[in-house]
């Protein structure tokens, strides 16, 4: 759904989905609960579901919310803490310092669904981006908002590029 292989608005029943995957309805039902939580499907009456319409603006808002929570997490990090490891490990580390379980769960959903999808699409890893954002933030740099916006736009562009490949369209 996120890649665009299943077009927005596509409707199907749990039974149709289970049959097409060759599995029983129970694992499909469990998977659909996760997809609904991640914002990728919408439940309809009579055990039907519909693929969510993930417009560019919707994706931009989701990534902005994730960035807002990650900036909050950066401020909660101990002053001597560093972000190490690959890009996704750095995202996951930030999630652990958020004080409220709801914020951690929301950020987990954004990170593991949308950010991980974008990061996996990158031709070469960029492992120091969050560490550099943390450094800028700790230095009180006025460039922090612009740096975060650039990072969000990069992730958005990666997602839109993959989606356009499946839709046969160009990204802008």
Question: Which positions does each model-derived feature cover?
Answer:
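Eukaryote-biased recognition of C-terminal alpha-helical segments
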Residues: 111, 116-120
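C-terminal all-alpha effector/ligand-binding and dimerization domain
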Residues: 119-172
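All-alpha effector-binding/dimerization core of bacterial HTH-type transcriptional repressors
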Residues: 38, 51-112, 136-142
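Short, hydrophobic secondary-structure boundary micro-motifs
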Residues: 8-10, 44, 103-107, 145
């Amino acid at each position: 759904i996120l890649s665009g292989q299943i077009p927005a608005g596509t409707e199907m029943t749990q039974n149709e989905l289970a049959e097409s995957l060759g599995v029983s309805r129970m694992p499909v039902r469990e998977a659909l609960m996760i997809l609904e939580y991640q914002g990728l499907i919408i439940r309809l009456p009579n055990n039907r579901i519909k693929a969510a319409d993930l417009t560019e603006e919707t994706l931009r808002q989701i990534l902005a919310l994730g960035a807002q929570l990650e900036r909050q997490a950066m401020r909660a990090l101990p002053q001597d803490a560093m972000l190490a490891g690959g890009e996704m490990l750095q995202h996951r580390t930030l999630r652990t310092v958020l004080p409220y379980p709801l914020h951690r769960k929301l950020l987990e959903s954004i990170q593991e669904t949308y950010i991980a999808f974008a990061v996996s699409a990158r031709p070469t890893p960029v492992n120091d981006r969050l560490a550099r954002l943390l450094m800028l933030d700790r230095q009180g740099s006025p460039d922090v908002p612009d740096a975060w916006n650039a990072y969000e736009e990069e992730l958005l562009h990666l997602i839109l590029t993959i989606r356009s490949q499946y839709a046969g369209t160009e990204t802008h």
